Structures are given as C-alpha cells and as structure tokens.
Amino acid sequence: MKIGILALQGAFAEHAKVLDQLGVESVELRNLDDFQQDQSDLSGLILPGGESTTMGKLLRDQNMLLPIREAILSGLPVFGTCAGLILLAKEITSQKESHLGTMDMVVERNAYGRQLGSFYTEAECKGVGKIPMTFIRGPIISSVGEDVEILATVDNQIVAAQEKNMLVTSFHPELTDDAHLHQYFIEMCKEKRQ
C-alpha cells in the first residue's frame, strides 16, 4: 500500500511520519509528474493542513487540480485535514469558487479565528472513538449534503465528516500522538482496493 501526500505546502511531513509509524509507505506529490507517475500505485491521497488559498493556487499552477479531482471522483480515497478539507469543499463561504469541489459541504475558512485562538480538545469520532483534536485557525463545516456522514462535532460544530471515499477533519490529527484517524483512513483505502 502506498499513500500519496500533497506536498506543495503545509503539514505534509507530519502526515508522512504518522504513516511511517503505521508501517505504510508514503510518497510526496510536488507536481503533476509526481502524481501521474505514482497515480496507478496509490491506494489513497492525503491533502494536508496549510494555507488553502496558496495550496489551491499551486494546484492550478502545477496543473494538478483537474487530474486530482478526476482521481477522487473516480473513487481514489482522500483524507483532507484543515486546509485539505477546504480544498475538497463544494462551497467556501468567503470565496466565489471552490478548489477541487468534490465533497458536498459548505465550509467557512479560519472560523476558529487567528493562530492565537487555536485550541486542543478531545471528542468522540464515529468509528474511531475518543480522539485528541488540535485546531489551528481551522475551518467549520457549516452544512453538509444528505450523503455526507457527520463523524464528529465540537461545541455543536461539525469537525469531521465522510462522503463515500472522502474523509475530512477541521483539526490536525497529524499533530498529535494518536494515529486512530490515519488508521481509519488506511482501512478505507484497503476496502477500496478489494
């Protein structure tokens, strides 16, 4: 099994470290050639936290947006954390257009405020159990379509969800010592390959 990690900007190294600890091979995808070269071998894709506007621009500049979108729509499992969640959203409240736009949800960028407003909590996540959650200027999922399953909420806000092959979190599971969500994603990837 090999998981691709979008490595244009953001917390991609932290995701690679978690996958390594779980014994799963990962590959950093920095450009279209990387993606096309590894696409047939990929069991899944991680879109890390970072700055979503910058990542969206780089995806367009590297001509990666449409090929990644097509792969996701064709069933490639994807795990978007924080900025990765924003990349997957069909609608972003403060922007005219979405980026990949594959997941039926509306999100509000930086809803948890400035970096100083970042926080840590623990909450139940459906199918995973109680997990630590680190929020750094995280987005809020303000609404979801009928096919989207809400996995976790904090203070009545949706912070984790899944729609078919797409898993998203408003928080950064890669910044904790808990690998349960990554393991959940790996199981999604295994199911898809069967």
Swiss-Prot record:
Provide the GO biological process annotations. glutamine catabolic process; pyridoxal phosphate biosynthetic process; pyridoxine metabolic process
E.C. code: 4.3.3.6, 3.5.1.2
Name any one Pfam family assigned in the record: SNO
- Stored InterPro entries: Class_I_gatase-like, PdxT/SNO, PdxT/SNO_CS
GO MF, one annotated term:
pyridoxal 5'-phosphate synthase (glutamine hydrolysing) activity
Keywords (A to Z) from UniProt: Glutamine amidotransferase, Hydrolase, Lyase, Pyridoxal phosphate
PROSITE patterns, per the entry = PDXT_SNO_1, PDXT_SNO_2
> What catalytic activity is recorded?
aldehydo-D-ribose 5-phosphate + D-glyceraldehyde 3-phosphate + L-glutamine = pyridoxal 5'-phosphate + L-glutamate + phosphate + 3 H2O + H(+); L-glutamine + H2O = L-glutamate + NH4(+)
Name one cellular component (GO) term. glutaminase complex
Q: In which pathway does it act?
A: Cofactor biosynthesis; pyridoxal 5'-phosphate biosynthesis
Residues holding L-glutamine: G50, E51, S52, R109, I136, R137
Catalytic center residues: C82, H172, E174
At the top level, the lineage of the source is: Bacteria
Role of this protein: Catalyzes the hydrolysis of glutamine to glutamate and ammonia as part of the biosynthesis of pyridoxal 5'-phosphate. The resulting ammonia molecule is channeled to the active site of PdxS.
Per the record, the similarity remark reads: Belongs to the glutaminase PdxT/SNO family.
Q: How does it assemble?
A: In the presence of PdxS, forms a dodecamer of heterodimers. Only shows activity in the heterodimer.
Indicate what this protein is called per its UniProt record.
Pyridoxal 5'-phosphate synthase subunit PdxT
Source organism of this protein record: Streptococcus pneumoniae (strain CGSP14)
- From the UniProt record, report the name of the gene that encodes this protein: pdxT
